[in-house]
């Protein structure tokens, strides 16, 4: 089965979307790392490795951050779909 051909314009859009996705994920990672580091690791530390409490804190922080990110993404998607439906109704 042959794959459908994509126009050059669609390829450019796809490339842009992929680049934006990478940039957004990189930004999420950086913000999450900074937030959890500030919350869980004291500014002055003497150990070269994380302590058990710090590891647990970071694990929970990352889990919460990703959970909230997912919930916000779902809510924004739902709102966007509602807006699209409203626009369709208004244009009919």
Curated annotation (Swiss-Prot):
Subunit details: Heterohexamer; composed of 3 copies of Tim9 and 3 copies of Tim10, named soluble 70 kDa complex. The complex associates with the Tim22 component of the TIM22 complex. Interacts with multi-pass transmembrane proteins in transit.
Domain of life, source organism: Eukaryota
Family affiliation: Belongs to the small Tim family.
Domain notes for this protein: The twin CX3C motif contains 4 conserved Cys residues that form 2 disulfide bonds in the mitochondrial intermembrane space. However, during the transit of Tim10 from cytoplasm into mitochondrion, the Cys residues probably coordinate zinc, thereby preventing folding and allowing its transfer across mitochondrial outer membrane.
Entry's Gene Ontology cellular component terms: mitochondrial inner membrane; mitochondrial intermembrane space protein transporter complex; TIM22 mitochondrial import inner membrane insertion complex
Localization, UniProt: Mitochondrion inner membrane
Motif extent (Twin CX3C motif): 36-61
Membrane topology label: Peripheral membrane protein
Molecular functions per Gene Ontology: metal ion binding
Protein's UniProt name: Mitochondrial import inner membrane translocase subunit Tim10
Cysteines joined through disulfide linkages: 36-61, 40-57
InterPro entries cross-referenced by the UniProt entry: Tim10-like (IPR004217), Tim10-like_dom_sf (IPR035427)
GO BP: any one term: negative regulation of innate immune response
Summary of the function given for this chain in its UniProt record: Mitochondrial intermembrane chaperone that participates in the import and insertion of multi-pass transmembrane proteins into the mitochondrial inner membrane. May also be required for the transfer of beta-barrel precursors from the TOM complex to the sorting and assembly machinery (SAM complex) of the outer membrane. Acts as a chaperone-like protein that protects the hydrophobic precursors from aggregation and guide them through the mitochondrial intermembrane space.
Keyword entries, A-Z: Chaperone, Disulfide bond, Membrane, Metal-binding, Mitochondrion, Mitochondrion inner membrane, Protein transport, Translocation, Transport, Zinc
Protein species of origin: Drosophila melanogaster
